[in-house]
C-alpha cells in the first residue's frame, strides 16, 4: 500500500509538471519494465537483453530531441542488431528470446513513451489523464462488478478471477468516467476537439479494452515462462 501511494504521488506530480521530469520517469520505468520482462526469459543481463536496452535508450533520445523521423531507423537497426547477435551466437539464444527482446521494446518502451508524447502535445495536460481514467477506471469497476455479478470466466487459463461481467462493467465504468471527465475540462481546452465529451468517451472505451488485453498479454507471458510475478524491484 505504501509503495502504491508513493508511486501514485510520483506519477501525478510528473504528469502535472511534464517536461524532462515526466520524460525521465517514462524512460526509467520503461527500462525497469523491460528488465523484468527479459528477466522472465533469463536474458536480462545477457548481450541480447542489453541490446534491447540500448535500442530503447536510442529511441528515447529521438523522442526527447523530437526527431520522430529517426525513430524508424532506430527500430530497423535495432532489429538488425538483435538478429545479428542471435545468428552469431547461435544456439545460445532461442528464436523466442530474440522476438521477446524486440517485442519488449514496443510493448514497454514505445507504449510508455506516448504518455510523454501526449503530455507535450496540444492540450496534453488534460488529455494525458485519459490514460489513467481508462486503465484505473476499468480496473476499479471491473473488480467490483466482478465480485458482485461475475459468473462467466473470461480467460480461465490466463486469469481465472477475471469474468465477462467484470470486463463489461470495467469498460462501461471507464467510458462513463471519460464522459464525466470530458464535461469537467471541456471548457478549459483550446478547442482541439469538436466534441471533447464524446471523444473522451470513445478514447476511454478503447483505452479500457487495451488495458484488458495488455493485462491478459502480461499474464500469458508469465504462463509461458512459468513464473508467478515479473519481479520485486518495487516492494509491495
Q: Which residues make up each language-model segment?
A:
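Interfacial loop-to-transmembrane junctions
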Residues: 223-236
Amino acid at each position: 500500500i505504501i509503495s502504491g501511494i508513493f508511486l501514485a504521488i510520483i506519477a501525478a506530480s510528473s504528469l502535472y509538471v511534464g517536461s524532462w521530469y515526466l520524460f525521465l520517469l517514462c524512460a526509467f520505468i520503461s527500462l525497469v519494465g523491460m528488465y523484468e520482462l527479459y528477466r522472465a526469459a533469463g536474458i536480462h543481463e545477457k548481450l541480447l537483453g542489453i541490446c534491447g536496452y540500448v535500442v530503447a535508450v536510442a529511441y528515447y533520445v529521438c523522442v526527447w530531441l523530437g526527431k520522430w523521423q529517426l525513430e524508424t531507423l532506430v527500430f530497423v537497426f535495432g532489429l538488425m542488431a538483435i538478429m545479428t547477435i542471435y545468428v552469431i551466437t547461435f544456439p545460445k539464444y532461442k528464436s523466442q528470446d530474440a522476438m521477446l527482446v524486440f517485442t519488449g521494446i514496443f510493448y514497454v518502451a514505445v507504449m510508455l513513451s506516448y504518455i510523454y508524447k501526449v503530455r507535450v502535445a496540444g492540450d496534453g495536460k488534460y488529455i494525458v489523464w485519459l490514460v489513467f481514467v481508462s486503465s484505473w477506471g476499468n480496473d476499479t469497476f471491473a473488480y467490483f462488478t466482478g465480485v458482485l455479478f461475475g459468473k462467466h470466466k473470461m480467460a480461465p487459463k490466463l486469469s481465472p478471477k477475471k469474468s465477462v461481467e467484470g470486463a463489461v462493467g470495467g469498460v462501461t465504468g471507464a467510458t462513463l468516467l471519460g464522459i464525466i471527465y470530458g464535461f469537467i475540462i471541456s471548457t478549459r481546452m483550446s478547442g482541439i476537439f469538436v466534441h471533447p465529451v464524446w471523444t473522451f468517451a470513445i478514447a476511454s472505451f478503447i483505452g479500457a479494452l487495451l488495458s484488458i488485453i495488455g493485462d491478459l498479454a502480461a499474464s500469458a507471458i508469465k504462463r509461458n515462462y512459468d513464473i508467478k510475478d515479473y519481479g520485486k524491484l518495487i516492494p509491495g
